[in-house]
Each structure stands twice: as structure tokens, then as C-alpha cells.
């Protein structure tokens, strides 16, 4: 009996193969995206760094230079280095104490907000004693005697401690070398003077109103109004004469000449005489707070 082919079984097998091959292969999964690397947290300033920054801010001083024609201010550090822009406005004329305080408060407000100074130094164009004004010849008002200007300004500026001396004395603090007798002459709206011995400020000498020539005081002889009237050439001769008078009067080891008109000097200065930048009126404010005492 001839053997029968298992056609049914083979057909079903072929059908199974076709069925399997007809199925699509499963789609390959895309590799999982790596999570972005986390940035390490920013390091906080160390306690020592924070204290150093606080000390730096605590050393900041608002230095104010009151002149007969301009009010100037800047923030300085304990070494007298300027740490802010220098701001300036014209001095009001006539200028009462209240007008001056108002003008200064407006002038320095941006510096206070941005730099947070801890103290205030003031150079004033007149005789100052114990933070009070005794004379203010270039401010055009007679109501200045005994005015507690430092306290008035402190009251307007949040109670910050304030020290105030004559403006020529502030310039001298920035310029002096601290050896021997050093004298300061400032040439601006008027003539200012200051005397130092071994770096220490001596009692104030107000030579500006002392007669020097034909009944004219220093202010009237070499002040800015006198320069404008006489011309720079004659004015230079007058300043040269004053240097000789001061040498005989004070017998200084060094004479420093400051103020806005010091830049107008054209003659050769003696070896022991030097001109200083007008910025000294700001920079010297730092030494008002140095531990070394200053005599009234």
C-alpha cells in the first residue's frame, strides 16, 4: 500500500512559518537620555570672608570738602583711597547753615545709598573748634558763629558720627610726611593755613585775615578775587612773596601748597616747597579718624 503524503501537516507548518515571518519585529527602544549633570551648589562666602567684607564697609568714610565756590564729596577707605565717584555742586550764596545742610544732604544721598559709609569727615572753610563753626568768611552769611554744623549734618544723615576741622587742615593731613614742622597754604576762594609738628595737627592759625600788604589780608592779597583782578602774572609774584614771609614766620621744614589755584603757579618752587593735588581735600578726611590725636 503506497504511503500517503502528510500534506495537511506540511501545509500547516508552512502557514505557521508565514505567520511568524509576517509579524513585525518589535521596534528597538531609543536609549534613555542621560539626565543633565547637576551643577555643584555655589559656595557660600566663608565666615572670614564675610567678616572681612563687613570690616571693609565699616572702614568707609564719607569725606566732604566745603569750599567757598563748590561742595565736593566722595567715599574713601581708611587709607584715604577714593572708592566712589566724586560729586560736586556749587556752594549756595549767600549760604545759611540750614541751606548748607540741605545742599549737602542732597549731594551725598546717592553715595550713602550705594556705599554705606560708617563715618563722615568734613573740611570747612573757616575756624572750627570742637565740631562747631566759629567763622565762615566765604559763605556770605553772618549767622555762623557757634553753629554745631557736624551735629546738624549727622542728624540729617542717619546719626552717623561726624568730625569736622578746617579745610586747609584736611588737605594737610593728606599731604604731610609726619616729620618736623610742616606748614600748609591753600589757594582757593581765599587763603587757608594749617600747622603740623611731627605729623600732629597744631592749634589753628587763621592767617587769612592777617594784614600782609598795604592793609590787605592774605585773602585780599592772594585769594581768587585778587588773582582775577591782578592777573596770573602779578598774582604769582604775590604768592612767591608770601612763601618768603611764611618761611621767616614759621621756619618750616616743609611747605605744602594746595587748593584749586595751586595749579596756576608758574614760578620755580624752593626745594622744601611742594604743590599737592586738590583731591587732598577729600583724601585727608581718612586721617581725621586715625588713632593719633589732633589738638584743637
What are these regions (language model features)?
Residues 70, 246-278:
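Glycine-rich phosphate-binding loops at beta-strand->alpha-helix junctions
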Amino acid at each position: 500500500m503506497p504511503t500517503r503524503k502528510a500534506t495537511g501537516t506540511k501545509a500547516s507548518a508552512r502557514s505557521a512559518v508565514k505567520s511568524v515571518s509576517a509579524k513585525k519585529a518589535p521596534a528597538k527602544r531609543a536609549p534613555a537620555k542621560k539626565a543633565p549633570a547637576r551643577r555643584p551648589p555655589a559656595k557660600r562666602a566663608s565666615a572670614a570672608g564675610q567678616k572681612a567684607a563687613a570690616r571693609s564697609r565699616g572702614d568707609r568714610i564719607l569725606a566732604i570738602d566745603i569750599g567757598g565756590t563748590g561742595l565736593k564729596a566722595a567715599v574713601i577707605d581708611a587709607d584715604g583711597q577714593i572708592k566712589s565717584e566724586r560729586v560736586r555742586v556749587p556752594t549756595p550764596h549767600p549760604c545759611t547753615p540750614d541751606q548748607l545742610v540741605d545742599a549737602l544732604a542732597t549731594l551725598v544721598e546717592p553715595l550713602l545709598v550705594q556705599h554705606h559709609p560708617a563715618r563722615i569727615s568734613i573740611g570747612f572753610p573757616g575756624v572750627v573748634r570742637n565740631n562747631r563753626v566759629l567763622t565762615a568768611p566765604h559763605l556770605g552769611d553772618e549767622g555762623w558763629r557757634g553753629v554745631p554744623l557736624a551735629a546738624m549734618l549727622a542728624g540729617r544723615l542717619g546719626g552717623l558720627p561726624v568730625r569736622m576741622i578746617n579745610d586747609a587742615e584736611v588737605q594737610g593731613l593728606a599731604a604731610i610726611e609726619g616729620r618736623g614742622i610742616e606748614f600748609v597754604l591753600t589757594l582757593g576762594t581765599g587763603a587757608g593755613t594749617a600747622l603740623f609738628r611731627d605729623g600732629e595737627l597744631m592749634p589753628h592759625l587763621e592767617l587769612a585775615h592777617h594784614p600782609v600788604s598795604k592793609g590787605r589780608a592774605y585773602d585780599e592779597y592772594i585769594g581768587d578775587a585778587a588773582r582775577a583782578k591782578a592777573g596770573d602774572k602779578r598774582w604769582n609774584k604775590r604768592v612767591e612773596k608770601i612763601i618768603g614771609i611764611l618761611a621767616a614766620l614759621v621756619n618750616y621744614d616743609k611747605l605744602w601748597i594746595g587748593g584749586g589755584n595751586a595749579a596756576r603757579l608758574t614760578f620755580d618752587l624752593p626745594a622744601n616747597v611742594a604743590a599737592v593735588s586738590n583731591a587732598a581735600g577729600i583724601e585727608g578726611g581718612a586721617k581725621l579718624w586715625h588713632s593719633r590725636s589732633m589738638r584743637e
